[in-house]
């Protein structure tokens, strides 16, 4: 669509190829350590890490104040969210060394299923939650937005694609560059 994939364009919606990084819990968190970690993720300090790692932070973050709980937290899911979550985990554990966080990397659906089944405290998804996941009691929180750059080989005669063309390529409706004529 002729729009550069910059943070500003992703935030203002003119560049539309992006996805949310969601975390989900089964209803209200009862694990005090997990709630404290969630508060950290959504804080000014947590969102600064989101931005440092190249993602778009959420608005409205406030300074973090820990309740200083102890215990363990299990986070499960998306391999796309996992590298960011690892950075957030490391930073939080320096703020509160009395909490141990186990990060289980798999995929978004496994993370949501594990959360629904009580196998983890927090699930990670690099997509919107499905209606059946919400119906099962999951509560999602967007922790970041991930802009996705569409890259074409320099040797290709194509120097710009529309959103519809990209969609059709990924759906298999366009299978040859000549079809973009």
Please identify what each model-predicted range represents.
Residues 1-181:
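Exported/periplasmic ABC-transporter solute-binding proteins
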């Amino acid at each position: 669509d002729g729009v550069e994939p910059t943070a500003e364009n992703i935030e203002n919606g003119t560049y539309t190829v992006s996805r949310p990084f969601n975390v989900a819990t089964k209803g209200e968190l009862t694990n005090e350590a997990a709630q404290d970690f969630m508060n950290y993720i959504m804080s000014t300090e947590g969102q600064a890490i989101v931005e440092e790692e190249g993602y778009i932070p959420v608005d409205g973050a406030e300074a973090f104040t820990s309740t200083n709980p102890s215990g363990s937290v299990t986070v499960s899911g998306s391999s796309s969210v996992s590298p960011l979550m690892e950075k957030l985990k490391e930073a939080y554990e320096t703020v509160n060394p009395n909490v141990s966080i186990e990060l289980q990397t798999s995929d978004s659906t496994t993370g949501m299923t594990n959360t629904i089944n009580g196998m983890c405290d927090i699930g990670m998804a690099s997509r919107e939650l499905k209606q059946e996941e919400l119906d099962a009691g999951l509560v999602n929180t967007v922790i970041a937005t991930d802009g996705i750059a569409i890259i074409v080989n320099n040797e290709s005669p194509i120097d710009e694609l529309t959103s519809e063309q990209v969609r059709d390529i990924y759906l298999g409706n366009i299978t040859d560059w000549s079809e973009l004529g």
